[in-house]
């Protein structure tokens, strides 16, 4: 069973995001900001939108390398509305032993429903509902 996983969502607009799973539990961070890849420093001053249109694979590579350094996931799963073909990634700044397995998903709708279900369960457990 995978313990540490990152799911990257790359839409056609620049609202890229990521879900982080730590020890098989969704990690949100103290202010629920964990996974907001669009705010990484190399995405500043509108460059993110330009890079997304010009070189979406390069943008994903930078995001994956950042995740490897900060989070060190075993798997990175990607859903991209921009890259239609599965790509091989050039993660040269990350030593091979620290590179994650990378997989692609075709349909994110099912995962969104599962995530919403899990959020509702979490709120019930915490007594928020």
Set out the residue ranges of the language-model regions.
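ATP-binding/phosphotransfer module of carbohydrate and carboxylate kinases, centering on a glycine-rich
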Residues: 26, 44-129
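Phosphate-binding/catalytic loop of phosphoryl-transfer enzymes
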Residues: 1-45
């Amino acid at each position: 069973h995978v313990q540490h996983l990152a799911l990257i969502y790359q839409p056609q607009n620049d609202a890229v995001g990521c879900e982080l799973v730590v020890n098989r539990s969704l990690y949100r961070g103290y202010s629920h900001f964990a996974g907001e890849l669009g705010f990484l420093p190399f995405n500043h001053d509108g460059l993110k939108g330009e890079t997304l249109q010009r070189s979406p694979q390069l943008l994903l590579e930078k995001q994956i390398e950042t995740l490897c350094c900060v989070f060190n996931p075993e798997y990175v799963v990607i859903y991209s509305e921009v890259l239609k073909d599965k790509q091989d990634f050039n993660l040269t700044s990350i030593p091979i032993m620290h590179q994650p397995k990378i997989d692609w998903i075709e349909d994110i709708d099912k995962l969104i429903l599962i995530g919403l279900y899990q959020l509702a369960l979490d709120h019930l457990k915490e007594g928020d509902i």
